């Protein structure tokens, strides 16, 4: 097994781990905010979805970069 494959696997794994932790924090804080102020639910949900999308973009970029690196 080459070192490049190991590096790509670590990059993808750490990216997924970070995204999972980030998504959990975003959703938990959104639920706390909705419980505290239910009238702000639409605004908080919209902000949550934007935040989750941004957090999920990073692991996808990591996968793309690892494929590019392995293609060399």
Swiss-Prot record:
User: Do you know which Pfam families this protein is assigned to?
Assistant: ATP-synt_C (PF00137)
MF GO annotations: lipid binding; proton-transporting ATP synthase activity, rotational mechanism
**Where do the TM regions start and end?**
1-21, 48-68
Keyword tags? ATP synthesis, Cell membrane, CF(0), Hydrogen ion transport, Ion transport, Lipid-binding, Membrane, Transmembrane, Transmembrane helix, Transport
In which broad location class does this protein mainly occur, judging by the first location in its UniProt entry? membrane
- Classification via SUPFAM superfamilies: F1F0 ATP synthase subunit C
Q: Which GO terms describe its cellular component?
A: plasma membrane; proton-transporting ATP synthase complex; proton-transporting two-sector ATPase complex, proton-transporting domain
- InterPro entries associated with the record: ATP_synth_csu_bac/chlpt, ATP_synth_F0_csu, ATP_synth_F0_csu_sf, ATPase_proteolipid_c-like_dom, F/V-ATP_Csub_sf
Report how it sits in the membrane: Multi-pass membrane protein
**Where is the site Reversibly protonated during proton transport?**
56
Q: Where in the cell is it found?
A: Cell membrane
Subunit (UniProt): F-type ATPases have 2 components, F(1) - the catalytic core - and F(0) - the membrane proton channel. F(1) has five subunits: alpha(3), beta(3), gamma(1), delta(1), epsilon(1). F(0) has three main subunits: a(1), b(2) and c(10-14). The alpha and beta chains form an alternating ring which encloses part of the gamma chain. F(1) is attached to F(0) by a central stalk formed by the gamma and epsilon chains, while a peripheral stalk is formed by the delta and b chains.
| Free-text function comment from the UniProt entry | F(1)F(0) ATP synthase produces ATP from ADP in the presence of a proton or sodium gradient. F-type ATPases consist of two structural domains, F(1) containing the extramembraneous catalytic core and F(0) containing the membrane proton channel, linked together by a central stalk and a peripheral stalk. During catalysis, ATP synthesis in the catalytic domain of F(1) is coupled via a rotary mechanism of the central stalk subunits to proton translocation.
Member of which family?
Belongs to the ATPase C chain family.
Name by which UniProt lists this protein: ATP synthase subunit c
Q: Lineage of the native species?
A: Bacteria, Bacillati, Bacillota, Bacilli, Bacillales
Q: Which gene encodes it?
A: atpE
